[in-house]
Design a protein with these regions (language model features):
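Acidic, PIN/NYN-like endoribonuclease modules and their adjacent C-terminal/linker elements
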Residues: 1-2, 20, 92, 97-120
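Short, well-structured N-terminal submotif of metal-dependent ribonuclease cores
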Residues: 1-33, 43-56
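Short active-site oxyanion
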Residues: 4, 27-30, 61-63, 96-101
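Histidine- and aromatic-rich ligand-binding microenvironments
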Residues: 8-9, 33-34, 84-85, 106, ...
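A generic structural signal for short hydrophobic patches within well-formed alpha-helices
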Residues: 13, 38-41, 72, 109-110
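A general structural signal for well-ordered alpha-helical segments in protein cores
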Residues: 38, 52-55, 68, 72
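Amphipathic alpha-helical segments within well-ordered protein domains
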Residues: 39-42, 56-59, 76
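Active-site neighborhoods of divalent-metal-dependent phosphate/nucleic-acid chemistry enzymes
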Residues: 64-105
Length: 120
């Protein structure tokens, strides 16, 4: 891989799935995905079988990072510091734990201290 590693927020993965050009430059690196994003992507109740198949193929090209005790602790710290949803705190904690950027189009992450954020 010639690119850099980063944690992909769920909306980044949706943009990849939809073929958005502005995310293509990121796809040369290692795409790390929190298990939370996997659940958010595949857990939508209106997801059709073909979409689910395509999303699974997309996720197969990513590294799924599980929720560890250290990430749980970081997510709790983040939630104690700022008002953010628990899934977003876990995704941010994954980025912080791995010490790699979080790529997202969600401005809510801007309030979280201690993470490197790349807004797309």
């Amino acid at each position: 891989m010639t690119g850099f590693s980063f944690v992909a927020d769920t909306n980044f993965l949706i943009a990849v799935h939809e073929g958005k050009e502005y995310v293509e430059s990121f796809l040369d690196g290692a795409v790390i995905v929190s298990v939370i994003s996997e659940i958010e992507l595949l857990g939508w109740h209106k997801l059709k079988a073909e979409e689910k198949r395509l999303l699974r193929l997309l996720l197969d090209d990513c590294i799924i990072f599980e929720l560890t005790a250290d990430i749980r602790k970081l997510a709790i710290e983040i939630r104690q510091q700022v008002n953010i949803k628990t899934p977003d705190a876990i995704i941010a904690a994954t980025s912080k734990y791995l010490q790699i950027p979080l790529v997202t189009s969600d401005n809510d992450f801007k309030i979280i201290p201690g993470i490197e954020l790349i807004l797309i």
